[in-house]
Amino acid sequence: MEHEFWLQSWHEGRTGFHQLRVQPLLQKYWPTLDLPTGSKIFVPLTGKSLDMAWLAAQGYRVLGVELSLLAVQQFFAEHGLKPAVRESHYGTHYTARNIEVICGDTFALDAALLSDCSGIYDRAALIALPPELRVPYINELMTCLPAGCSGLLITLEYQQQEMVGPPFSVEEAEVLKCYSPRWCVKLLERNDILPQEPGFAARGLTKLATAVYQLQRLAV
């Protein structure tokens, strides 16, 4: 995903990727991770996702990162929150209650920031990246998370030649290859969702599935 494409999408209101409800797969599978209340959860490329508010409502501390200032501002405004704002070398931090969102580049984060995260929730980051950026994302960013960190990864699967991403198709074989050997990856569920996504059908897709994986960071 090019920075300019993402920023322009928010500026022009082309945010059809934003879900107007909490992701059902998050609600279904997050409790199975059995993470203690108060754990810090890392959410990359947040947009203004309602999933952050849901995680916070479960008692978790949310640490998100988002490139678009508009997305960050809209998230807090739409939840009636007035965040405290501070600057760091990571970007601009917006914090209200138990939610902190850094407006900055996801690839600028490091282990010093992420070493106390017990969980990871990726619904939008991996599928937003073209193939050439997925391995750096996993090798350079995901390895900053500590051993024992667990979470969920949600992907889309379709015939890539039928549509220009983002979002991109990321098949199970690629997930397993990219996350190995530093992560234990388990497929939890895969569903055909094209009937519920007419917008993707209109873009030419003949098949569309979503898959959810459980991730566990290994001491490697």
UniProtKB/Swiss-Prot annotation:
* UniProt keyword Cytoplasm present: yes
Q: Which UniProt keywords apply?
A: Cytoplasm, Methyltransferase, S-adenosyl-L-methionine, Transferase
GO MF annotations, alphabetized: thiopurine S-methyltransferase activity
Q: Which GO terms describe its cellular component?
A: cytoplasm
Gene3D superfamilies, per this entry?
Vaccinia Virus protein VP39
Q: What class of enzyme is it?
A: transferase
The protein's Enzyme Commission number: 2.1.1.67
The protein's location, in the record's own words, is: Cytoplasm
- Matching InterPro entries: SAM-dependent_MTases_sf, Thiopur_S-MeTfrase_Se/Te_detox, Thiopurine_S-MeTrfase, TPMT
Give the UniProt family note. Belongs to the class I-like SAM-binding methyltransferase superfamily. TPMT family.
Q: What is the protein name stated in its UniProt record?
A: Thiopurine S-methyltransferase
